[in-house]
Amino acid sequence: MLVNLNDVLIPARRGKYAVGLFNTVNLELARGVMEAAEELDSPVIIGTAEVLLPYGPIEDLANLLIPMAERASDRKSVV
């Protein structure tokens, strides 16, 4: 599910655990990260590398990733 970053990081700080940020360079990698997070019942942060921005607007990437995160299981969080 798509959540606010504070909804993930505040519990992580209290629970003394890390939340991984994964830079994704394509949809297959993003899907793989989300599926692994779901299997492990762990929150993840999906990012992208700034060097990739000249290849397409960030809005286009967001239009693809946000629906994927919204469809993700309630058992995990994606920000």
Model-found features: residue ranges?
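Catalytic domains of carbohydrate-active enzymes, especially glycoside hydrolases
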Residues: 36-44
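Anion (oxyanion) recognition and catalysis
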Residues: 13, 38, 70
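Conserved, mostly hydrophobic/aromatic
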Residues: 23, 33
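Glycine-rich, proline-tolerant flexible connector loops at the mouths of alpha/beta enzymes
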Residues: 21, 44-59
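Conserved active-site and cofactor/substrate-binding residues in soluble primary-metabolism enzymes
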Residues: 3-4, 24-28, 56, 60-63
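Conserved small/polar residues in nucleotide/adenosyl-binding loops
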Residues: 78-79
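N-terminal amphipathic alpha-helix/helix-capping segment at the start of soluble metabolic enzymes
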Residues: 1-21
